[in-house]
């Protein structure tokens, strides 16, 4: 059957209802059928981002959905990306390029301009592809944000597309979520909602069926599919830091998690490694004995450094290094390992200079220009020539004696730094563990002698196929609906 919708939007009753996964699953299914399908999210708010081939920045969810559709990620797939830098402000990225930081009130006033960028990207995609699958953000029931909405029903109304509403039954209250969401919508918004998807169901479906019939009677709209709870998926998480681990080995790696952690998917390969015990440490928790400590990236490096010190972790890191432990710093974590971080132009807040951990002989100056690039190179440590691939997203330049001992060689240039005793390694390279050869080399450098290589791309592909198979009933139900009338 032919897919009847040139554009279809997936909205959720709550955050984390399954919108991203559902769009990815439908992208994979339609691509397998030869449909030229493309994912699209008008506005995304996330610290976990991806770099496109042309050096732009989009939400990692849209990069995953692009992979599901068999496409290279493109900035038109996510024209507006908001990267929170504080509780009330965010960096605004339009068409892949950072514009400036705005507080919530200023951005709300800016939304009509942002909508123009959204519609420009949507217009290009809809002209190039047969089907555009759109992901909403959060919930359309945020009545306080309805004015100037560009992420949910505001966009659907602007392009006149149908909407399906997904709700997570695993968290409870699924019928109230759906009925309550519909009650918050306008008459035209309710009319364009063509059906519901119940996500993450586990149990006896016969016990759910009376509730489904009641829901359909109350709303006059069909339940298009009930999708199962799928365990053990290896898909890029975008919002909350993933705490679960598919394997737990003897080699302990500890990651202190600051408030503004960015690109936590850097650790996905370690989470899946059978010889690794990956532990993410939150506020108030002491850093336990470890073979390797990794300082992650940060959207507010100086602020997160202050928070790390106030949490008592500086002493633990220095003690770990003193007794021969290995430390890796990635992006903002790399900057923290140095002597100072200067922000003369107030890129991250008030201008000033912060004293770093002084574990690497480098100094960093933050600059407004953002480095965005997909990169390929070689490891430059431990007498290895292992290949490495990843991406850079950072604002600032790090220099110093430790840079004469680089971590990697990227396109012929040295990248990153190592301490003179080779205990500390820092780099701007995100995704360094995703290349199996580089992951093995880094773990050997840290003290784990293992031949195991985790292929994250293969695990991701297998998970995309799993979610696509589970979503087949939804696709069948959608194909059975009447196409929209002009």
Swiss-Prot record:
SUPFAM superfamilies assigned: Class I glutamine amidotransferase-like, P-loop containing nucleoside triphosphate hydrolases
One family name in Pfam for this protein: GATase_3
The keyword Protein biosynthesis is assigned to this record: no
Record-annotated GATase cobBQ-type domain positions: 250-438
Coiled-coil region: none
UniProt keyword annotations, A-Z: Cobalamin biosynthesis, Glutamine amidotransferase
Family statement drawn from the similarity comment of this UniProt entry: Belongs to the CobB/CobQ family. CobQ subfamily.
Record-linked NCBIfam families: cobQ (TIGR00313), PRK00784.1 (NF001989)
Protein name: Cobyric acid synthase
Provenance organism: Herminiimonas arsenicoxydans
